[in-house]
């Protein structure tokens, strides 16, 4: 198999790919030590059985630029096929503010076709293509070079088998007339708000047992500082402080370093320096805040707006479960 290491090589492959009705794409990345995913490898395949119809792309090569791929993403005549696309899309959006159009997610399509919710790629390959995926390289450090033959084989199979999975699911959707369901549900994956995390909105992800507006104000400001710090330093949120530590801080409301030293859950590194200052500033801000500025949870009796496409998908799932 071929690994593309220059922009010129990727440009030639993407130019060829534009003559095909679809391409299958996957990524390998690392995120354990960073806020943003680090793209380490791309796999792309077009229909066909030739060796050159599927390639690896090395984004870590100094001579590589992904602009040819993003140009392909904008070509609406070529369907871009992914499996469980959300994390892949996040990488592309953060890198270039671009989404592949049109997008086909085989995990969404498989759900509509009765394979179950969030079905894995390995399962679809086994059931549809009748092949076994080698998962021995699943926990590879994809940033290391050179990649072994086994790692390359594992990576390329994530797009070669995907071609058969896509064609089967596409046929099933056409046969049952459910293409529109997949289109609408997949379009939700290309909503920038999913990937652009606004620090002041980060509190909505935190689970707490207390719903008082003032308590939520502490959580909001602490979550906003954590999100901003993690983004600007490109470190995981939990490296700043974990959710349970945040809830503890919202309860104890520390305003001095001595107060912080009494925390049971706060990381030692967070009890001094920039993080400690950020925590105390957040608490002080809420202490002086007008109650009208506190966040408010929606009332439980507010009418829920149900996406009709989602309702249809749920009905399909229920039917599949009962058969």
Regions found by a protein language model. Name each.
Residues 1-23, 27:
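N-terminal accessory regions of nucleic-acid-interacting proteins
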Residues 27-33:
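An active-site-proximal beta-strand-loop segment
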Residues 3, 43-67, 72-163, 189-193, ...:
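Active-site-proximal helix-loop-helix substrate-binding element of RNase H-like nuclease domains
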Residues 149, 169-323:
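Accessory DNA-binding and partner-docking regions appended to nucleic-acid-acting proteins
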Residues 31, 40-43:
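Residues that scaffold, gate, or flank divalent-cation-dependent active/transport sites
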Residues 36-38:
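A short, glycine/Asx- and small/polar-enriched loop/turn
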């Amino acid at each position: 198999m071929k690994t593309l290491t220059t922009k010129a090589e990727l440009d030639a492959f993407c130019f060829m790919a534009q003559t095909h009705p679809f391409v299958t794409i996957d990524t390998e990345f690392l995120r354990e030590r960073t806020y943003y995913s680090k793209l380490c490898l791309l796999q792309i395949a077009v229909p066909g059985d030739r060796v050159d119809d599927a390639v690896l792309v090395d984004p870590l090569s100094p001579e590589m630029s992904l602009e040819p791929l993003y140009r392909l993403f904008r070509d609406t005549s070529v369907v871009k096929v992914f499996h469980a696309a959300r994390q892949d899309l996040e990488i592309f959006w953060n890198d270039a503010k671009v989404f592949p159009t049109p997008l086909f997610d085989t995990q969404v399509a498989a759900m509509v076709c009765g394979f179950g919710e969030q079905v894995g790629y390995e399962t679809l390959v086994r059931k549809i293509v009748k092949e076994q995926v080698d998962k021995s390289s699943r926990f590879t450090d994809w940033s290391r070079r050179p990649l072994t033959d086994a790692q390359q084989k594992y990576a390329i199979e994530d797009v070669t088998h995907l071609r058969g999975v896509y064609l089967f699911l596409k046929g099933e959707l056409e046969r049952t007339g459910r293409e529109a369901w997949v289109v609408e549900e997949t379009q939700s994956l290309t909503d920038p708000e999913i990937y652009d995390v606004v620090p002041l909105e980060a509190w909505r992800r935190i689970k707490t047992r207390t719903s008082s507006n003032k308590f939520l104000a502490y959580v909001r400001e602490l979550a906003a500082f954590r999100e901003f710090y993690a983004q600007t330093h490109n470190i995981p949120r939990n490296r700043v402080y974990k959710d349970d530590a945040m809830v503890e801080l919202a309860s104890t409301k520390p305003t001095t370093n001595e107060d912080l030293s009494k925390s049971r859950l706060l990381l030692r590194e967070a009890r001094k320096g920039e993080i400690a200052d950020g925590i105390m500033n957040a608490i002080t801000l809420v202490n002086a805040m007008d109650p009208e500025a506190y966040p408010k949870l929606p009332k439980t009796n507010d009418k829920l707006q149900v996406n009709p496409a989602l309702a249809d998908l749920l009905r399909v799932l229920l039917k599949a479960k009962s058969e």
